[in-house]
Amino acid sequence: MLRYYGATRNLPLVFSINKFMLRPSSFARPFHYSSYSLQNDDTPDKGSTNKSEIRTPNNTVWKENIELQWQHLKKKLNELYSRFNFHRDQLSFQVNKAKKSIQEANRKLSEQENEINDSRLNYNKDELTSAKIEGLPSEREQHRKKWSRKLEFYFDSLQETLFTATRALNDVTGYSGIQKLKSSISLMEKKLEATKKEHKLFKAQYANAIDERAQSQREVNELLQRQSAWSSSDLERFTQLYKNDALNARQEQELKNKVKEIESKEEQLNDDLYRAILTRYHEEQIWSDKIRRTSTWGTFILMGMNIFLFIVLQLLLEPWKRKRLVGSFEDKVKSALNEYAKEQNMKMDKLLPGKSSEVTDQGNTKNSIVEEHIEQRGECKINTAETDRPEVATAEATTTAMKSFRDIWERIKALFVTLKSIQYRKLDAPLVFDTLEFYLYSISLVSMTILVSGLI
């Protein structure tokens, strides 16, 4: 509210935002920070004009803050609801996909049962020996229990739902095209079966049409033989047979054309199915060769990585670890011997106070003896650690010269005995090999890996 105390006597002019009013000065409220009085000819300064702004009520500020908080909370709730809907849709999609996979597994199981009972797929005669071929996969499937086959189909169908990486791998390796070719082959087989049924139907209709026409022609010939003795009914019958003969000839020709068309379609489907099956087996052979080459190279890469890691561990990490252990052991021994020497010096000082100089000299000599003892302990630390394993000591004591295959075999046996005697649970137990044993171990590892990969 703005107030103006001006030239009028005792009636101030009160300027308000809402209304304009006059009231006595005794009833006017005193000056506060939201009103500005201009008495006589006083003019406000620039500093006071900045304070002439109207103060907003507290309830308006409170409403604005509440509204901002409500809008922010509403936005968060909308985001949470949209996220919940997204995850719900994803869950329902996966559940429906799992249901479809189970239905597909049931369908495959029923198809397998039908294939077992199909007489066309039961040919098991060996042409060379005229004996029965045994050990076919279909026979083994027959001997399996139904629940195990059903469980296998369920796992195979759910694998496509749970492991989408398989589909990506198939796309990368090209097996998705082979699967499409397999599905097209199954569709072609169904079309061929339907075409064969249709061919049989039209062929039967064509045979019936030929029989009907032949019968009508025989009846016409009989009527023509006794043409001189025709009656009115014979004349009507001859006329009807003549008309039917024309219709039968037309129907016979149509059925003949349809039979030819169905036969050509059946031959085309047979040729396409034969070529599709050949293409499928050819592509599967190419795919299997590609996967075999990839697995071989992967095996070699893994073998190289193992050898590299073994070399790094034996040539870099193990010496560093051994050096660190030896250094920590030396520091502990030095600190322990120094403490022991100090204690002995203090005891000698208490017992013989007059001979302190001699004690100090003896302490110096003891320190020199301790240092020499530490050096000797640092040099023979590995040898003392190896006394618990006589096999390792004997392996290092043997000469590196080998003169025959028997020496090589004995050396390899000693190497494996050494490996067997290693205490793997103790991290501070060093692995001691010489250069020849290391090369023998690497060569045996490489040869065994190549042998296993070749057998696979």
Swiss-Prot record:
* Top-rank taxon, per record: Eukaryota
Q: Which residues lie on this side of the membrane: Mitochondrial intermembrane?
A: 318-435
- Any Pfam family from its record, for instance, is She9_MDM33
Q: Which UniProt keywords apply?
A: Coiled coil, Membrane, Mitochondrion, Mitochondrion inner membrane, Transit peptide, Transmembrane, Transmembrane helix
Choose one Gene Ontology CC annotation of this protein and give it.
Answer: mitochondrial inner membrane
Q: Which residues lie on this side of the membrane: Mitochondrial matrix?
A: 32-296
Tell me what topology the record assigns in the membrane. Multi-pass membrane protein
> Start and end of the transit peptide?
1-30
Subcellular location per the Swiss-Prot or TrEMBL entry: Mitochondrion inner membrane
Principal location listed in the UniProt entry: mitochondrion
The residues that cross the membrane are 297-317, 436-456
- Subunit record text: Homooligomer.
Task of the protein: Required for the maintenance of the structure of the mitochondrial inner membrane. Involved in mitochondrial morphology. Causes growth arrest when highly overexpressed.
- Any idea what this protein is called? Sensitive to high expression protein 9, mitochondrial
Q: Which organism is it from?
A: Saccharomyces cerevisiae (strain YJM789)
Q: What is the lineage of its organism?
A: Eukaryota, Fungi, Dikarya, Ascomycota, Saccharomycotina
